[in-house]
Design a protein with these regions (language model features):
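AMP-dependent adenylate-forming
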Residues: 122-125, 140-208
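His-Asp-centered acyl/peptidyl-transfer active-site segments
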Residues: 23-25, 31, 41, 94-97, ...
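A generic structural signal for short hydrophobic patches within well-formed alpha-helices
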Residues: 3, 87, 113, 183-184, ...
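Conserved AMP-binding/adenylation subdomain of ANL enzymes
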Residues: 3-28, 38-78, 139
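Gly/Ser/Thr-rich phosphate-binding loop
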Residues: 44, 49-54, 78-81, 87-148, ...
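Conserved AMP-binding
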Residues: 33-37, 60, 130, 180
Length: 208
């Protein structure tokens, strides 16, 4: 439920639930990330949660450049979630049919902003380490620089703190702290308590 709620802003903004032809999927989502990469959950559940068609892509094809365009067109792919490094390898024409492009996993290079924007397409920059269930915040890319990671999504909290855990002022540097419903936990309560300790200065019971 955490991941689905995290995807909601981008999905709603892209109007994926618009008119659909009877008997046809409303959208086609590329599944191009390795399942060993946590961001693959974004592709899978994005499609399943909204009745879209999930289209697996061969890993060798995703890593290539010119071969991606014809594959995306042939498979009617309209939604792509990937990392900037990969999308930078693809020719602009490869994304002609894509109306929702979600990027994350690494910094968004400024030089990609103009190249990826197109009429009828929304581009989102997302941030969230594996420890925070893939996505904790997101921002629509508008062309304004620098490219931002956005505000926390529903159920999440973000804060930038100093060395003593106190929130810093606007324009000041500090460490980004994440709190919220999707922080990881597993079979070792002691290790969980160590890695996701409380942040009393923020009033958070768990933080990363």
């Amino acid at each position: 439920m955490t991941l689905l709620s995290a995807l909601s802003p981008a999905l709603a903004a892209a109007d994926l639930a618009g008119p659909a032809r009877r008997g046809q999927a409303i959208a086609w989502v590329m599944a191009g990330l390795s399942v060993a990469f946590d961001a693959s959950c974004e592709e899978i559940w994005l499609a399943f949660a909204h009745g879209a068609c999930l289209v697996p892509a061969p890993r060798s094809l995703v890593r290539s450049g010119v071969d991606v365009g014809p594959w995306l067109t042939a498979n009617q792919v309209s939604i792509v979630s990937t990392v900037p490094t990969l999308v930078a390898l693809w020719p602009p024409a490869a994304l002609d049919r894509v109306r929702l492009l979600i990027l994350g996993g690494e910094a968004f290079p400024p030089e990609l902003v103009t190249r990826l924007q197109a009429p009828g397409r929304e581009v989102w920059n997302t941030y969230g380490p594996t420890e925070a269930t893939v996505v904790a915040c997101a921002a629509m890319v508008t062309g304004e620089l620098p490219v931002r990671i956005g505000l926390p999504l529903a159920g999440w909290d973000l804060a930038v703190v100093d060395g003593e855990g106190r929130p810093v002022g606007i324009g000041e540097s500090g460490e980004l702290i994440i709190g919220g419903v999707g922080l990881a936990r597993y079979l070792d309560p002691a290790k969980d308590a160590e890695k996701y300790a409380p942040m009393p200065t923020l009033g958070w019971k768990r933080a990363y």
